[in-house]
C-alpha cells in the first residue's frame, strides 16, 4: 500500500512541476499575444500570486474537514480550469481572462502544494524513511520536463492554445488516477490527533529561530520565484535571444535546481546544514551577479546553472530546520512555508514593476540583495544543541 501511495505522490509532485514550468516556458509568447509591457506582465502575474496564496489558506480548511485526498482532487480541477481559461484568454488576447486563469491555476497549485507535502510527511512516518527531498526533486524534474516540452512545442510551431489545453488534460487525468492510491482522510486524521499543548501561532512568531528561518525562506524563495518568472523574458530582452533559446536557458536553471536537491542529502549529513546553505548562497549570488554583468551568453548560461544550484536548498533546508522539534513543528513549519510561498509568489510581480522602469537585468540587483540578507541568518538552520542527542 505504501509503495503505491509513494509512487502516486511522486507523480503528483512531477505533474505539478510540469504544469508550472509549462506556463513559464510560454510567458514570452503570451506577453506578445497580449501586447503587454513588463509592468503589465508583473500585474498579470499577481493573479497567479494571489490565487496561490488563497489556495494555501483554503487548503487547511479542506484538509482538516475532508483530508488530503479530497484537497488534491479539488486542486486538480482548479488547475485544469485555470489552464483552460489561460489558454483561451491568450488566444483572445484578453488580459482579464489570462489573469483570471492564472488566479484559478494558482489557487489549485497552492492547495495541491500543501496537500501533497502533507501526504509526503505521512508516508515518511509510515515507512520510517526520509523521502521528502526525493519528492521535491521530482517536482524539479517535472519543471525540467515541462520546459523541455515547451522547447519542443515552440520549435514545432504548436500554438499556446493547444499546448496549454493538452497539459491541462494530462494534469487532471493523471492526478485523478493517482488519488485512487491515496488513503482517505490523511490530513483530517492528523489534525484531529494534534495535542492541545502545541505552540500557539503568536508564540511561534515570537521565537527568534523561527523568525530567522522565515527570513531565509522569504529571501531565497523570492530568489527562486524571480528566476522562474523572469529568466525567459530577461534572456529575450537582456540578451536578445529567441523564445526557444530563452526556454533552453531557463532549463539550465532547472537543471541546477535538480542537481542541488539530488546531491545535497549526503552532503548535508556529512558537512551540516549551515555550511551547505552558505555554499548555496555563494553559488546563487555569484551566478546572479555574472548574469547581471552581461559578459557573454556562454558565461550567462553557466551562471544561470549556478543560480539554480544555489537556489535549490534554501526552502527545503529551512523547512527541515523548522521541524527539528516535533513538539512545535506544526506551527513553525507552517510559518516558514507561508513566508516562502508568499515571497515566491508576490515578490516577482513587484520585481516586474521595477523592471519596467530600469530593465530586468538591472532589477535583478534587488534579487541579489535578497540573497545577501539570507546569508546573515544562516546559523539558524543548525540543529539546536538540546536536540542533537536525539
Where are these regions (language model features)?
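Juxtamembrane intracellular "pre-TM" segments in multi-pass secondary transporters
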Residues: 1-3, 185-213
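Hydrophobic core of transmembrane alpha-helices in multi-pass small-molecule transporters
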Residues: 14, 95-112, 299-312
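Helix-to-loop junctions at the C-terminal end of transmembrane segments
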Residues: 55-68, 154, 260-272, 355-356
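C-terminal ends and interior cores of transmembrane alpha-helices
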Residues: 77-92, 283-295
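Intracellular juxtamembrane helix-capping segments at the cytosolic ends
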Residues: 110-125, 312-326
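Symmetry-related core transmembrane helices of the 12-TM Major Facilitator Superfamily/SLC fold
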Residues: 161-180, 362-380
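C-terminal transmembrane helical hairpin of 12-TM major facilitator-type secondary transporters
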Residues: 271-318
Amino acid at each position: 500500500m505504501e509503495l503505491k501511495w509513494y509512487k502516486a505522490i511522486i507523480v503528483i509532485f512531477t505533474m505539478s512541476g510540469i504544469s508550472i514550468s509549462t506556463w513559464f516556458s510560454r510567458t514570452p509568447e503570451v506577453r506578445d499575444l497580449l501586447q503587454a509591457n513588463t509592468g503589465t506582465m508583473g500585474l498579470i502575474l499577481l493573479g497567479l500570486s494571489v490565487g496561490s496564496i488563497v489556495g494555501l489558506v483554503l487548503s487547511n480548511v479542506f484538509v482538516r474537514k475532508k483530508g488530503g485526498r479530497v484537497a488534491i482532487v479539488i486542486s486538480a480541477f482548479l488547475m485544469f480550469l485555470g489552464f483552460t481559461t489561460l489558454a483561451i484568454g491568450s488566444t483572445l488576447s484578453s488580459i482579464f481572462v489570462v489573469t483570471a486563469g492564472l488566479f484559478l491555476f494558482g489557487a489549485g497549485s497552492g492547495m495541491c502544494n500543501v496537500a501533497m507535502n502533507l501526504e509526503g510527511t505521512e508516508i515518511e512516518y509510515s515507512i520510517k524513511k526520509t523521502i521528502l527531498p526525493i519528492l521535491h526533486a521530482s517536482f524539479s524534474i517535472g519543471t525540467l520536463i515541462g520546459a523541455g516540452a515547451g522547447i519542443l512545442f515552440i520549435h514545432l510551431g504548436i500554438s499556446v492554445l493547444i499546448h496549454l489545453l493538452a497539459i491541462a488534460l494530462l494534469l487532471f487525468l493523471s492526478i485523478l488516477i493517482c488519488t485512487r492510491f491515496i488513503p482517505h482522510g490523511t490530513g483530517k486524521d492528523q489534525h484531529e490527533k494534534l495535542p492541545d499543548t502545541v505552540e500557539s501561532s503568536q508564540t511561534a512568531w515570537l521565537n527568534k529561530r523561527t523568525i530567522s528561518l522565515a527570513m531565509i525562506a522569504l529571501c531565497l524563495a523570492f530568489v527562486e520565484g524571480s528566476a522562474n518568472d523572469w529568466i525567459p523574458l530577461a534572456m529575450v530582452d537582456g540578451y536578445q535571444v529567441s523564445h526557444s533559446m530563452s526556454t533552453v536557458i531557463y532549463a539550465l536553471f532547472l537543471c541546477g535546481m535538480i542537481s542541488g536537491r539530488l546531491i545535497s542529502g549526503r552532503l548535508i549529513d556529512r558537512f551540516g546544514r549551515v555550511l551547505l546553505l552558505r555554499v548555496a548562497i555563494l553559488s546563487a549570488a555569484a551566478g546572479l551577479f555574472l548574469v547581471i554583468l552581461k559578459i557573454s551568453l556562454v558565461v550567462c548560461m553557466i551562471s544561470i546553472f549556478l543560480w539554480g544550484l544555489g537556489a535549490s536548498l534554501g526552502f527545503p533546508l529551512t523547512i527541515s530546520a523548522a521541524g527539528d522539534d516535533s513538539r512545535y513543528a506544526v506551527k513553525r513549519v507552517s510559518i516558514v512555508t507561508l513566508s516562502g510561498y508568499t515571497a515566491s509568489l508576490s515578490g516577482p510581480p513587484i520585481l516586474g514593476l521595477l523592471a519596467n522602469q530600469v530593465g530586468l537585468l538591472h532589477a535583478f540587483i534587488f534579487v541579489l540583495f535578497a540573497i545577501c540578507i539570507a546569508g546573515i541568518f544562516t546559523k539558524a538552520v543548525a540543529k539546536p544543541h538540546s536536540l542533537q542527542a536525539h
